[in-house]
Amino acid sequence: KNKGKVDGRLEGDHGGSAGILRSGKVSTWEGGQRVPAVFWAPGRIRPNTTCKTMASTLDILPTFTTLAGAKTPKDRDLDGEDISRLLAGRFDEARMEKVYYYYLRTTLQAVRQGKWKLHLPRPAKRPWLAPFAKNKHIHPKDDAAFGEPLLYDLEGDVSETTNVAQANPKVVKQLLAIAE
């Protein structure tokens, strides 16, 4: 605000800490994927509300198109979805069960559905990391190879500290089938 008026800018502040989330950028752990977003539209978005439903930057174009009262183009497919209902404070349960795919470059590394996130096995040699090899912000533990899928309950363990794959073999099987 400037003297009580908004000057028309859209600003973002992307700090260097992922807080309690595991790892950081250049990873498919939650610390590398989650980015907070702040939206402000008086009369359309209630102040001081929080939405924990997943969304993507791909959703920005269709959402802003709706908020502007325009129509999305019909001659092409848009990758994102209109999330204006979420911004208006209306929960979308169906969106919580959508499948989200976590890629690093061109390699599928994890799949999420609902509260479950499955990290797919990773080999010791990972060609997708070559461009980032000198990145000192990647923790060795988060870059380690593993031969079995790792399953996390993100509702109870957003920091991805406890692998619950052995206790939930049906969930692992279901998410592996989705990944294939």
Report residues per predicted region.
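Catalytic cores of eukaryotic secretory-pathway lumenal/extracellular enzymes that build
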Residues: 34-35
